[in-house]
Amino acid sequence: MPIPGTERKTHQMKILSAEVLNLMHIDLDKREALIRDVVYEVMSGLDAPDLSDQIVVTYWINAQTLTPAEVGKEISYHMTSGVRKSPPGSLLDQCTGRVIDAVDFDDTHRMGVVRVGFPLKMLMDEGGNLYSTDIFHITAGEGVFGLTENIDVKLCHIAMSDDVLRLFPGPAYGAPGIRQITNWGDDVAFGTILKPCTGITPEEESEIIAQAAANPLFIFVKEDENYLPGVPFAPLKDRLTHANEAIRRVSDQRGDKGLIYAPHITAPPHILADMVKMCVDAGMNGVMLSEYFIGGAIRMVRELTKDLTNPPVIYAHNGGISVRTRHIYREVLDLFTRLDGGDFRQTAPLTNGSSLLRPFGVEWKHCEYELSRPLAGHPPVMMARAGGLDQGNIILNLLDVANGAGIANYLFLAGSAVNGIKNPLGEYDPAIGAEAMRQALQVYRDGVFTRIDASHIQDLKSYAYQNGLQALSTALAQRYHI
């Protein structure tokens, strides 16, 4: 027993004033949604800018003393030539930004939208290449976000001409290519994530891989992002050896359906290229990484593998993105992930209640738009609806995509909804989770539910019970405690 008075206090309270608490309790998601709605409304009424020699960036501004137009001039000054006035037609002039236009939001003239043009002359390299790292280095630098004059700034949109968009490599495959190389046709594409997330040996992981790879429901299987490639108990090279063996061992159970397997390779820049080469040498047809703490990593992998006959599919994981999206809109980051070469990109599933993960609402719609819209010949990304996707909301998501863009550009990616379902012995049994997902898909195909309401989970559970869909009934009971 600890000596009285020496126990560590784990719960304490500090009394704060109502004013401080009110500021701390601001609903930032609600605020972001309101700002985004107004920004897009304003943008829709602006004239199309001249993009022949510049990219045009839209910022939302909340300043202390300057108008949005004046803030735009400061951004141009600090982040382009650093010259207030340049000789017309000079090289200096060609490397100096311009304010295109501005819209004030109130009579204080301190809040609004401004569009700033950044010259291509100062952004392109000597080979005529353009890089997202350089674009963000300039358009989202400290001369934008670090100035104390600016209470809050958001980078909302970057407009580029088709000629500029074609300077980027884009996805090697995208959704159409992924379906082609796996012989998936127009079937619904499901994927799963290996669990446990970490703390397993290559031998243990191989058994989990074999279970998933044997199931022709899945077009895609990936490691979890928590399973770092350099851990001593499971170094990547050993994992690849065992993964290959596991996939080969069960390949005859897949019929004519291919499978993309993506090991996790996120690593520091001086190591990452070696990780990519290791995967290529091992014959891996996919890799997964997040670049938000390693700038430019997606483009690096794309460039490193572009001359291969069959480059690996890139699952551009978005781990770390939310630390940026209060200032750089997520849809802008997703656009550049597509341009840099990501083949898969997570958005988020629709759910029957509050979303587990961002994005949602208008942000979510714009992300899916940027990942799939016509883009100077670049293929659409295969969007992974993941993060809480399960048997209870899969029909909602299938109905949504069927009534919208169609299933072709979507991967329905479930982790714990497959690998976290237990059998009657209390053991985790991915086969039950996968079968439950297959049964939910069949319920959708049978047209049992044409719309989803508040009672959907209970209604689906009742239908599963009445029709002998034991796996689906079990999964819903465990996921929703019903």
Predicted regions and their residues:
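Extended, intrinsically disordered, low-complexity segments
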Residues: 425-482
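Surface-exposed amphipathic alpha-helices with a cationic face
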Residues: 178-182, 240-255, 301-309, 362-377, ...
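Catalytic alpha/beta core domains of metabolic enzymes, predominantly
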Residues: 272-277, 282-414, 432
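Glycine-rich, proline-tolerant flexible connector loops at the mouths of alpha/beta enzymes
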Residues: 218-240, 349-356, 422
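Active-site mouth loops of central-metabolism enzymes
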Residues: 60-66, 188-206, 260-271, 318-329, ...
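N-terminal active-site wall of soluble small-molecule enzyme domains
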Residues: 239-246, 251-255, 259-280, 297
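N-terminal capping/small domains of soluble enzymes
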Residues: 2-207, 211-213
